UniProtKB/Swiss-Prot annotation:
Entry binding sites for ATP: G625, P626, N627, M628, G629, G630, K631, S632
Cellular component terms (Gene Ontology): cytosol
GO biological process, one term: mismatch repair
Any one GO molecular function term: mismatched DNA binding
Lineage summary: Bacteria, Bacillati, Bacillota, Clostridia, Eubacteriales
Protein name per the record: DNA mismatch repair protein MutS
Function: This protein is involved in the repair of mismatches in DNA. It is possible that it carries out the mismatch recognition step. This protein has a weak ATPase activity.
A Pfam family matched in the record: MutS_III
UniProtKB keywords: ATP-binding, DNA damage, DNA repair, DNA-binding, Nucleotide-binding
Organism domain of life: Bacteria
Length: 875
C-alpha cells in the first residue's frame, strides 16, 4: 500500500509495520490495541474476535481491523505466543491530550517465545530460555539466556560429535526459541530436530553472529576490556552465540538488561551426559504416558517451596555432577538437613515466605515491574534475616557458604516499605501507589482531590442560601466542567455574576469564576497526583534496579537452600540413604528401590533388590525372565540411583556405593518414527549405534530387549554381537535384559558376564511374580501365562500351549543336532582354536574387511554366496 494515499494515522501504521514484517503489530489507538489488514484477519481467526473495518484513506477504502482492550492485552498476547507468533507492541509515546497533531507512536517491545517476562506467560517451575547457535566447520557455539531471571550461559562443541552434543544440550535445556543466522537456518540437520521438538526458530541477521561484533557487544554490556574473566576469551563460537543472543534481546525488548550481569561458560563434559533417549526412557521430567510431571523422577523429588528452588532442582536432575567435591558438598548439606528435622522444618517454613526473587528482579531490571511486584519483593526480603538466623549454627560447608551469601538488602527493603502502599493497584496510572507521608506534594494533591467533593457541596449550599434558589444544584460534564443548574421558574433569582453556558428545556446552566477556580484545583489535583505518583514510582523502581545484582545473589542462595531442603525432605520421608560416590567403577546397591514406582504402589508393596555391577568380574549383567517380572524396573532404578547420587541427593536404598558415571545410556522400548520414515527396529539400532560409539569405560549402559524388532535369529545375532562389543571394546558397566536365553551361554565364554533373572513362582498353571533379582538365567519366558493374566481368550491361550509344545519339540531336535555338531567340533582342536584365535584364512580375512553396515541386503546375500563358495574350495 502507498502511505502517501493513506490517512496520517494509517500512514504511520504502515511505516511502522514495514519494520516488523514477521510480527503481528499491536497498534495502540486510545484504549485499544488495533490490528489491520492481514494481521487483523489472522488475529480475528486465532483469537475468535469480530473482524471490523476502518477507512484507510483516499483510494484505499476500508481495511480489515480487529482490536483488543489494552488492559487485557497480556492474555491475548499469551495465546498468540503459544501458537508460535511474534507480537510487536506499538505504544503511544505521548499523552494524546497534549499531542499537537498525530500522536507519536513506536514499537516499545517485540514479544517472542524466548523473551517473555510476564508471570502469566511463564512456566513457574521451569526456565524460559532463548538459545542462540553459532557455527563453523569446526563445531558449534551455544548460548542460552532467560530474560525473566537474568541467567546467561554459553558452551562450545568441537569435533566430529559437535552436532550430537549440541542437540543433546538443546534437548536438556528445552529453550522456547532458538535464533540462527540465515546460513544455519537452511541446514535441515539442525532445524529439523528443533522444529520436531516444538521449538520456535527465528532467523537473525548474520552480522550479529560475527565474532568481532559479538565480542564488542559483550564487552560493552559487561563494561569490561575483554572476556577473560568469563572464561570465553578463546572460545570464538561460544562468544559469537552469546553476543548474538544479547543483541537479539536488546532488539526485541528495547529496555535495560542490567540483570543479565554475568556469563557462565561451561563445558558439557563437566557434567554427566544424559541424551534425549535416556531422559525420555527414564522419565526424568516428563511422563511417557502424557508428557506431564506426575509419574516422573522430578514429581517425586520436587518438594521445593519456591519457584526458584523448583527450577534449580530440575536443572540438577537433568545435569548431574562429575566433580566429586561438589557431589560430596551437596551430600553433606542434605545429610545435615536430614538429621536436623527441626532446622529443616523451620527453614522450609521461612523459604515459603519468599516469592520468585529471580523473576521479580528481572522485571524490575527491564522496567516492567508494577507496585505489587515491589511489595512482593519487600515481603521476600523481610524473610531473609530470619533465614540467616535459622542457619546460624549449621556445620555443612555448603550451608555455611549459602548462609553467608544471603544479603539482607535492608536499604532496598526499607525504601519499598517507606514508599509503596501495602496493597497498591495493579495499574500504575490509577494512583494509590505511594504511601501517605512519602512525598509532600503527593499528600497535598491527594488532600485537594479528596476534599474537592466537600468543597463543591459547600459552594452548593452557600449559593442556595445566597440566591434563595432551594433547587439549585452543581453538576459536571466533560464539555465545560462544573456548572450551576437553575430550573426555569427560578431564573429571575439568578444573580448578575452568573455566566450562562447552556440552555435546556427545563433548566439553564451557569458558571462562576469561583466555581471555575475550584474546578481547576480539583481536576488538576486528581490528574497531577496520578502523573506524579507514576514519576516517583519509576524513580523508586530505578533505585531498586541498581541493586539487582545483590538481589540475584540472595535469590540464588535461597534457590539452592530450597533444593537441598527438598532433597532432605524426600530422603527423610521415604527412607533414602546417603550414597558413597567415589572414583571407582563399582555400582553396588543394597535394598534398592525405584523412586517413582514405590510412590504409586501400595505402602510396602515394592520389592527391593540388590545389584552389583563393575568393570571386572561383574561387567555385564544379563537379566532374563518374563514380561512384567521386573527386569526393566531393576535396571531403571539402578540408573536413577546413579543420577540422584550425582545430582547431590540421597538414594532409595539401604546402602549405595556408586563409582562416578560419566554417561547413562538407556535403550528401552521403541516405536516407529513416522516423521522420518524409520521403523521401530531402525530407531532401536540408531540408539544402540549411538551407545556403541559414545560410551566409555566409565559409562552405565542399560539395554532392554535389544533385537526384538526383527527376525529371531537376526535379533539374537545382533544382541550377541552388541554384548561382545560392549564387553571387549568398551568394558563399561552394563545391564542387559533379554528374552534371548541363548545369550546366557556368554557367561561361560566372556569373563565378567553374569546371568541373573527375576524370580517367578509357579502355582499350577498360574505364575506369581516375586520381582526379586536372583543369580542365574531363566529357563522359560512364561509368555503364555502372562498372556493369560492379560486377559487373552481361553481358546487362544490353549492354542498357544499346543503350538508351543510343537515348537519346543522341534527345537529340541535341532538342539540335539547342534550339540552333536559341537561335540564333533570339540574333537577337532584346530577348529576349536580358530574360534578363539583365527588363523590367516582368506575367507576370514575378507569377512573382517567387509563394511557390513554399508551393504544392502542383496549385496550382503551375494557376498555370502561368494564367501561360501570360496570356503568350499578351501576345504
Amino acid at each position: 500500500m502507498d502511505p502517501a494515499k493513506a490517512t496520517p494515522m494509517f500512514a504511520q501504521y504502515l511505516q511502522i509495520k514495514e519494520q516488523y514484517p514477521d510480527c503481528i503489530l499491536f497498534y495502540r489507538l486510545g484504549d485499544f490495541y488495533e490490528t489491520f489488514m492481514d494481521d487483523a484477519e489472522l488475529v480475528a481467526r486465532e483469537l475468535e474476535l469480530v473482524l471490523t473495518g476502518r477507512d484507510a484513506g483516499k483510494d484505499m477504502g476500508r481495511v480489515p481491523m480487529a482490536g483488543i482492550p489494552y488492559h487485557a492485552a497480556e492474555a491475548y498476547i499469551a495465546r498468540l505466543i503459544e501458537k508460535g507468533y511474534k507480537v510487536a507492541i506499538c505504544d503511544q509515546l505521548e499523552d494524546p491530550k497534549k499531542a499537537k497533531g498525530l500522536v507519536k507512536r513506536d514499537v516499545t517491545r517485540v514479544v517472542t517465545p524466548g523473551t517473555l517476562v510476564e508471570p502469566r506467560l511463564l512456566p513457574e517451575k521451569a526456565n524460559n530460555f532463548l538459545a542462540a547457535i553459532a557455527w563453523s566447520r569446526t563445531g558449534f557455539g551455544l548460548a542460552v539466556v532467560d530474560l525473566s531471571t537474568g541467567e546467561f550461559a554459553a558452551a562450545q562443541m568441537n569435533g566430529a560429535d559437535s552436532l550430537r552434543l549440541l542437540l543433546e544440550e538443546i534437548g536438556r535445556l528445552e529453550p522456547r526459541e532458538v535464533i540462527l543466522e540465515p546460513g544455519l537456518a537452511a541446514e535441515p540437520s539442525v532445524t529439523g530436530p528443533l522444529k520436531a521438538s516444538g521449538i520456535a526458530v527465528s532467523v537473525f541477521e548474520g552480522r550479529h553472529f560475527n565474532h568481532a561484533n559479538a565480542y564488542r557487544k559483550l564487552t560493552e554490556h559487561f563494561g569490561t576490556a575483554n572476556l577473560s574473566g568469563f572464561g570465553c576469551e578463546d572460545l570464538e563460537l561460544a562468544t559469537s552465540a552469546a553476543g548474538a543472543a544479547l543483541a537479539y534481546l536488546e532488539e526485541m525488548h528495547k529496555a535495560s538488561l542490567g540483570h543479565v550481569s554475568g556469563l557462565a561458560v561451561y563445558y558439557p563434559g563437566d557434567y554427566m551426559v544424559l541424551d534425549p533417549a535416556t531422559r525420555r526412557n527414564l522419565e526424568l521430567t516428563r511422563s511417557l504416558r502424557d508428557g506431564g510431571r506426575r509419574g516422573t523422577l522430578l514429581w517425586v523429588m520436587d518438594r521445593t517451596v519456591t519457584a526458584m528452588g523448583a527450577r534449580l532442582l530440575k536443572s540438577w536432575l537433568e545435569r548431574p555432577l562429575l566433580d566429586l567435591r561438589q557431589i560430596h558438598a551437596r551430600h553433606e548439606a542434605v545429610g545435615e538437613l536430614v538429621h536436623r528435622p527441626v532446622l529443616r522444618a523451620d527453614l522450609r517454613a521461612l523459604l515459603q515466605e519468599v516469592h520468585d526473587l529471580e523473576r521479580l528482579a528481572g522485571r524490575v531490571a527491564v522496567g516492567s515491574a508494577n507496585a505489587r511486584d515491589l511489595v512482593a519483593l519487600k515481603q521476600s526480603l523481610v524473610a531473609l534475616p530470619s533465614i540467616r538466623v535459622a542457619l546460624e549454627d549449621v556445620r555443612a560447608e555448603r550451608l555455611v557458604e549459602l548462609r553467608d551469601q544471603l544479603d539482607m538488602l535492608d536499604d532496598v527493603r526499607d525504601l519499598i516499605e517507606h514508599a509503596i502502599a501495602d496493597e497498591p493497584p495493579v495499574a500504575l496510572t490509577e494512583g494509590g501507589i505511594l504511601k501517605d507521608g512519602f512525598h509532600p506534594e503527593v499528600d497535598e494533591l491527594r488532600r485537594i482531590a479528596r476534599d474537592g467533593k466537600a468543597w463543591i457541596a459547600q459552594v452548593e449550599a452557600r449559593e442556595r442560601e445566597r440566591t434563595g434558589i432551594k433547587s439549585l444544584k452543581i453538576g459536571y460534564n466533560k464539555v465545560f466542567g462544573y456548572y450551576l443548574a437553575v430550573t426555569k421558574p427560578n431564573l429571575p433569582l439568578v444573580p448578575p455574576d452568573y455566566i450562562r453556558k447552556q440552555t435546556l428545556a427545563n433548566e439553564e446552566r451557569f458558571i462562576t469564576p469561583e466555581l471555575k477556580e475550584l474546578e481547576e484545583k480539583v481536576l488538576h489535583a486528581a490528574e497531577r497526583v496520578m502523573d506524579l505518583e507514576y514519576e516517583l514510582f519509576v524513580e523508586i523502581r530505578q533505585r531498586v534496579a541498581a541493586e539487582v545484582t545483590r538481589i540475584q545473589r540472595s535469590a540464588r542462595a535461597v534457590a539452592e537452600l530450597d533444593a537441598l531442603a527438598s532433597f532432605a525432605e524426600v530422603a527423610s520421608l521415604y527412607g533414602y540413604c546417603r550414597p558413597l560416590v567415589d572414583g571407582s567403577t563399582v555400582l553396588e546397591l543394597k535394598g534398592s528401590r525405584h523412586p517413582v514406582l514405590e510412590r504409586v504402589m501400595e505402602e510396602g508393596a515394592f520389592v527391593p533388590n540388590d545389584l552389583l555391577v563393575d568393570t571386572g568380574e561383574n561387567r555385564v549383567l544379563l537379566i532374563t525372565g518374563p514380561n512384567m517380572g521386573g527386569k526393566s524396573t531393576v535396571m531403571r532404578q539402578a540408573a536413577l540411583a546413579v543420577i540422584l547420587a550425582q545430582a547431590g541427593s540421597f538414594v532409595p536404598a539401604e546402602s549405595a556405593h556408586i563409582g562416578l558415571v560419566d554417561r547413562v545410556f538407556t535403550r528401552v522400548g521403541a516405536s516407529d518414527d513416522l516423521a522420518t520414515g524409520r521403523s521401530t527396529f531402525m530407531v532401536e539400532m540408531t540408539e544402540v549405534a549411538n551407545i556403541l560409539h559414545s560410551a566409555t569405560e566409565r559409562s552405565l549402559v542399560v539395554l532392554d530387549e535389544v533385537g526384538r524388532g526383527t527376525a529371531t535369529f537376526d535379533g539374537l545375532s545382533i544382541a550377541w554381537a552388541i554384548t561382545e562389543h560392549i564387553h571387549q571394546a568398551i568394558g563399561c558397566r552394563t545391564l542387559f535384559a533379554t528374552h534371548y536365553h541363548e545369550l546366557c551361554e556368554l557367561e561361560g565364554i566372556l569373563p565378567g558376564v553374569k546371568n541373573y533373572s527375576v524370580a517367578v513362582m509357579e502355582k499350577g498353571e498360574d505364575i506369581i511374580f516375586l520381582r526379586k533379582l536372583v543369580r542365574g538365567g531363566a529357563d522359560r519366558s512364561y509368555g503364555i501365562q502372562v498372556g493369560r493374566l492379560a486377559g487373552l481368550p481361553a481358546s487362544v491361550v490353549e492354542r498357544a500351549r499346543e503350538i508351543l509344545a510343537t515348537l519346543e519339540e522341534q527345537e529340541g531336535e535341532r538342539k540335539s543336532r547342534r550339540e552333536a555338531a559341537a561335540q564333533r567340533l570339540r574333537r577337532q582342536p584346530a577348529v576349536q582354536l580358530t574360534f578363539f584365535e583365527p588363523k590367516k584364512d582368506p575367507v576370514v580375512e575378507e569377512l573382517l574387511g567387509l563394511n557390513v553396515m554399508a551393504l544392502t541386503p542383496i549385496e550382503a546375500l551375494n557376498t555370502l554366496y561368494q564367501l561360501q563358495a570360496k570356503a568350499k574350495e578351501n576345504r
